[in-house]
Amino acid sequence: MGRPRDPQRIEARRAEVGAATLRTISALGIEGASLRAIAQEGGFTTGTLAYYFSNKQEILLFAGRTVLRSLVARIAAALSDHTTLRSLEKALLNELPATSDTRLGWQIWLAFTARVPSDADYRQEHEQRYAEIRILVRNNLNAAARAGNLAKGIDRAAEVDQILSLFDGLGLHALLEPEHFPPVRQRRQLRRAIRALERPRPTRKGEPM
């Protein structure tokens, strides 16, 4: 089968390979995602894979990039209202491994991040996407501060790192200790951390403290 010349067709086929790769990683782990296994999962031949990617490393990196870019896009979309911390809360709560779909995403993410320390390409992709997420969170905190929704005296740069560290930690421990970190606990911990940054609401006369 010849390689399509239409750029959109090429990208569509690469996306199909990427999706098959993610399914393979989910079933067999990243080490089990051989070219043969990926081809079998997607209904391709190994020759077809060679039309669209130079090697297995490029296929795996493409699949990992797809996961991270999708995460960034979803968080950005959820932060359409940049002035409230509740929008940030909702954006991150939706991504915790509290459902079968999000849990699968975290399992794949964990498989890829295991390669970050020893692989420059994976490290570059990871750093770039996390830089984008930090910008989104920082912009939310800055906008909340301008709107008067952020508590006074908050070190925003430090809070960005703290929020994302908690987010990653909850996701990781939810995979490793699912009984100790069930969905309700994941959400409660993250919600508590973000709401602690909110400016206290003025107490109305007659309202209990």
Task: Locate predicted features.
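Short coil/turn segments at alpha/beta junctions that flank glycine-rich nucleotide-binding fingerprints
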Residues: 27-31, 102, 147
